[in-house]
Regions:
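Cysteine-centric segments in proteins
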Residues: 1-103
Length: 103
C-alpha cells in the first residue's frame, strides 16, 4: 500500500462487457535531472472529499491525494492515454471524466 500526491491527475473511466471502472491517471514531473513518471491506479473504491483535494482509495489499498488545482494531463500522460485509445478491445470505451463525482 502506498500514498501518492501527483503533480497532475485525471480520472479515466473504462467501460467493457465486464463493467465500468474508474482509475486515477497520475503524473509527476522529473525536474532537471529526473525523468517524468506516470502511474495508473488499480481502481477507485471510494473517495474522500477534503478541503482542496480528493483522496482516492483504490483496490490495492493505495491512496492518491489529488489537489483540485492540479487536475489535467502532462504531455507524457496525454501521449499514454491516446496510445491506449488506439488499442481498445472492440466494444470497450475509455474516457476522461471531466467533472468527478462518485456516481
Amino acid at each position: 500500500m502506498s500514498d501518492y500526491v501527483p503533480d497532475k491527475w485525471v480520472i479515466v473511466e473504462t467501460v467493457t462487457s465486464e463493467g465500468t471502472t474508474r482509475k486515477v491517471l497520475a503524473s509527476w514531473y522529473g525536474g532537471y535531472q529526473g525523468a517524468d513518471e506516470w502511474r495508473l491506479s488499480s481502481g477507485i473504491t471510494y473517495t474522500e472529499d477534503v478541503e482542496g483535494a480528493y483522496i482516492f482509495h483504490n483496490e490495492s489499498g493505495s491512496t492518491y491525494e489529488c489537489i483540485l488545482g492540479r487536475q489535467g494531463m502532462s504531455i507524457y500522460t496525454y501521449d499514454r492515454y491516446h496510445s491506449w485509445l488506439k488499442v481498445l478491445p472492440e466494444g470497450a470505451t475509455l474516457r476522461i471524466v471531466e467533472e468527478y463525482n462518485e456516481d
